[in-house]
Amino acid sequence: MAHKKAGGSSRNGRDSESKRLGVKKFGGESVIAGNIIVRQRGTRWHPGDNVGIGKDHTLFALSEGKVSFQRKAGNRSYVSVIPMVEAAE
């Protein structure tokens, strides 16, 4: 008669891969059109001027400029891209 129960495999031991979410370009940083500014789940940050939103709520630059974060009415946070004034030649 066995005195020890058969050792079963652990029921834990699995984990999902990290999704690398968060702010990729911070306030004041320069961006070009297409640069990803924020990767997020849901709309923690909303798109402002010159910023587009992807189907997974990723915010990206629509034009060249500097990133700006601001909080507006309703306590919502918005991300905008302020176009750089090009020097007249």
Curated annotation (Swiss-Prot):
Keywords: Ribonucleoprotein, Ribosomal protein. One of its GO terms (molecular function) is structural constituent of ribosome. GO terms for biological process: translation. The keyword Ribosomal protein applies. Signal peptide: none annotated. Residues 1-22 are annotated as: Disordered. GO terms for cellular component: cytosolic large ribosomal subunit. Coiled coil: none annotated. Belongs to the bacterial ribosomal protein bL27 family. PANTHER family: LARGE RIBOSOMAL SUBUNIT PROTEIN BL27M (PTHR15893:SF0), RIBOSOMAL PROTEIN L27 (PTHR15893). HAMAP family: Ribosomal_bL27. This is Large ribosomal subunit protein bL27. It comes from Bartonella tribocorum (strain CIP 105476 / IBS 506).
